[in-house]
């Protein structure tokens, strides 16, 4: 096992612990809490894959971080912060829409790279809108938090979420998964649109008809 993979996991475990303390003291906002929950699932998956105990990894991660902070000068820290671009959190969905449980009458699930796609195949002849919460950097989608498909009545009929055991995905992974979700919903004569916000940051433009320019690969 690569030592950098292990140390990266250990540091991530400790930093998650620090962020959890922030939430416990009621200092975190909704996006902060959302990322914390998502990263917890990711860490559990990574720990299982690596065969590492999260609690033990957290203690080692603390030692690594303390050593770095001890050697880090305030001036170097200022320069690092100034040169690092800040990401933004984009919310198409409300907290209620993001956290709501939903059930499928005819479930279908497909894994597309590091993303999991879920579709209720019982849904027919509906107008459906795809909305997502995600982070943006340099005006491009950076990390998908969660994407959901809503009918006009507000029912959830589809979803795309990152796999906890497969951290990291690209903007192309997200667009490919959206294409698969659209294709699965349109198979039952549903009309699918993508929110303007998601179109803008994933494809760089937005169409009034709500349809982004999908490549042949993305239309599967």
UniProtKB/Swiss-Prot annotation:
Write down the HAMAP family for this protein, in alphabetical order.
Answer: INFV_NS1 (MF_04066)
Span list, region RNA-binding and homodimerization: 1-73
| A Pfam family it matches | Flu_NS1
SUPFAM superfamilies, sorted: Ns1 effector domain-like, S15/NS1 RNA-binding domain
Q: How does it assemble?
A: Homodimer. Interacts with host TRIM25 (via coiled coil); this interaction specifically inhibits TRIM25 multimerization and TRIM25-mediated RIGI CARD ubiquitination. Interacts with human EIF2AK2/PKR, CPSF4, IVNS1ABP and PABPN1.
A molecular function annotated in GO for this UniProt entry is: protein serine/threonine kinase inhibitor activity
- Enumerate the Gene3D superfamilies for this protein: Influenza virus non-structural protein, effector domain, S15/NS1, RNA-binding
Q: What positions carry the motif Nuclear localization signal? A: 34-38
Q: Where is this region: CPSF4-binding?
A: 180-215
Name the family the entry cites: Belongs to the influenza A viruses NS1 family.
Q: What is its main location?
A: host cell
Where does it live in the cell? Host nucleus; Host cytoplasm
| Function per UniProt | Inhibits post-transcriptional processing of cellular pre-mRNA, by binding and inhibiting two cellular proteins that are required for the 3'-end processing of cellular pre-mRNAs: the 30 kDa cleavage and polyadenylation specificity factor/CPSF4 and the poly(A)-binding protein 2/PABPN1. In turn, unprocessed 3' end pre-mRNAs accumulate in the host nucleus and are no longer exported to the cytoplasm. Cellular protein synthesis is thereby shut off very early after virus infection.
What's one GO BP annotation on this UniProt entry? Answer: symbiont-mediated suppression of host PKR/eIFalpha signaling
**Motif location (Nuclear export signal)?**
137-146
Q: Does the keyword Membrane apply?
A: no
Any one cellular-component term (Gene Ontology): host cell nucleus
- Domain of life according to the entry: Viruses
Q: Give UniProt keywords alphabetically.
A: Eukaryotic host gene expression shutoff by virus, Host cytoplasm, Host gene expression shutoff by virus, Host mRNA suppression by virus, Host nucleus, Host-virus interaction, Inhibition of host innate immune response by virus, Inhibition of host interferon signaling pathway by virus, Inhibition of host PKR by virus, Inhibition of host pre-mRNA processing by virus, Inhibition of host RIG-I by virus, Inhibition of host RLR pathway by virus, Interferon antiviral system evasion, RNA-binding, Ubl conjugation, Viral immunoevasion
What does the domain comment read? The dsRNA-binding region is required for suppression of RNA silencing.
Q: What is this protein called?
A: Non-structural protein 1
Please outline how this chain is modified post-translation: Upon interferon induction, ISGylated via host HERC5; this results in the impairment of NS1 interaction with RNA targets due to its inability to form homodimers and to interact with host EIF2AK2/PKR.
Output the InterPro entries linked to this UniProt entry. NS1 (IPR004208), NS1A (IPR000256), NS1A_effect_dom-like_sf (IPR038064), uS15_NS1_RNA-bd_sf (IPR009068)
């Amino acid at each position: 096992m690569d030592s950098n993979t292990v140390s990266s996991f250990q540091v991530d475990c400790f930093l998650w612990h620090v962020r959890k303390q922030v939430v416990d003291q009621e200092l975190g906002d909704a996006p902060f809490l959302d990322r914390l929950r998502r990263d917890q699932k990711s860490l559990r998956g990574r720990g299982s894959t690596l065969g590492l105990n999260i609690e033990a990894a957290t203690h080692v991660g603390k030692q690594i971080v303390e050593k770095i902070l001890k050697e880090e000068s305030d001036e170097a820290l200022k320069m690092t912060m100034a040169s690092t671009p800040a990401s933004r959190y984009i919310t198409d969905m409300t907290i209620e829409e993001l956290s709501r449980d939903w059930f499928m009458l005819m479930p279908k699930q497909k894994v597309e790279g590091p993303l999991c796609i879920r579709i209720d195949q019982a849904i027919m002849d509906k107008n459906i809108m795809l909305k997502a919460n995600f982070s943006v950097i340099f005006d491009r989608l950076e990390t998908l938090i969660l994407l959901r498909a809503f009918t006009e009545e507000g029912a959830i009929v589809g979803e795309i979420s990152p796999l906890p055991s497969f951290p990291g995905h690209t903007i192309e992974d997200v667009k490919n998964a959206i294409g698969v979700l659209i294709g699965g919903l349109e198979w039952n004569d549903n009309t699918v649109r993508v929110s303007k916000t998601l179109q803008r940051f994933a494809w760089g433009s937005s169409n009034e008809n709500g349809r982004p320019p999908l490549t042949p690969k993305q239309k599967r």
